[in-house]
């Protein structure tokens, strides 16, 4: 008896210890969240002045952590290990709701994948012509080479995708922090002049309006919901009944890393420019690095901008691929199940990969203008799935009831409603 208890304690200790796979997932979560959007965040978050920026910096960690922890717990609440979000949704809410949410989940993530395929083609094309002085190959060939390159990583499976993303995080963070250090001598006091409530109210749209419209910017700057289901399933297989504690720990470290690196970069950029500069950059709809390169006449920044963007887009593409594949697979499986049929998962993954390759290549080649609007329409769906669905499940699903009664749940619902209302306002204003 004593030996059994000792071995059980030893087993729990070994599972609670930090592992190499935990680091890999931590960096994978970071890699999915921090995409090319980081290059626009200093403009979108800083244009309202320092007061809204400081408030957003305070809200960033709890908003990101509690929401993503809720979605992770939702996936972990499924009866059977190995169930992804599309299966858990059906288990908790029924077949009809399961099909609808799976469809919405796919169409919220898939357009982001298409946007990234266009973005990486545009970025590499521009880098070749402006920085390297080369004539880029025809767009159809260039986009095919780039997408096949990223899809090659996909062919090696989920572990390789997460490993590739975690490796790409290091050069990305390194270059971002070097750039931040490079900008410190350029600091001026203009941004600090907005460090009062009176000035903040007079800046841009006013303090409360600026904060309201900035919440969705923060949500999507730290959003990594497309990889959460894969993350939860993998950790449940590895840690069993300790998966929830382990997932929460990995999420916390990933979110601290996200908030610190991104907000340091944002504050340093904002302190290097005046509010008028940030407003001009927003009006021209260019990234912060493109604006800084022109503003300070710094060729080094002009070189760094596309390199940072290429790394950021690649790792975010891989993370979003996992979510899009899950949604597509879920739709196919549910459709076949309704007809009394099934399909082998490896075969389905190959079909999904081919579909993703062909469609992302066509869209990257054609570069349709409607794509941005489709991606924007997916915003409220992502916010609902990330913020509201897990909180609703806590009230309605017995397996989630143990997480009720916490003030953090109210916080997540409030932030979710603020984000969704601001997205709709931005869409229709």
Curated annotation (Swiss-Prot):
Membrane topology summary: Multi-pass membrane protein
Entry's Gene Ontology molecular function annotations: amino acid transmembrane transporter activity; symporter activity
Keyword annotations: Amino-acid transport, Cell inner membrane, Cell membrane, Membrane, Symport, Transmembrane, Transmembrane helix, Transport
Periplasmic side: 44-46, 121-140, 185-201, 271-297, 369, 428-429
Keyword Transcription regulation in record: no
Family: Belongs to the amino acid/polyamine transporter 2 family. SdaC/TdcC subfamily.
Protein name: Serine transporter SdaC
Source organism of the structure: Shigella flexneri
Taxon lineage: Bacteria, Pseudomonadati, Pseudomonadota, Gammaproteobacteria, Enterobacterales
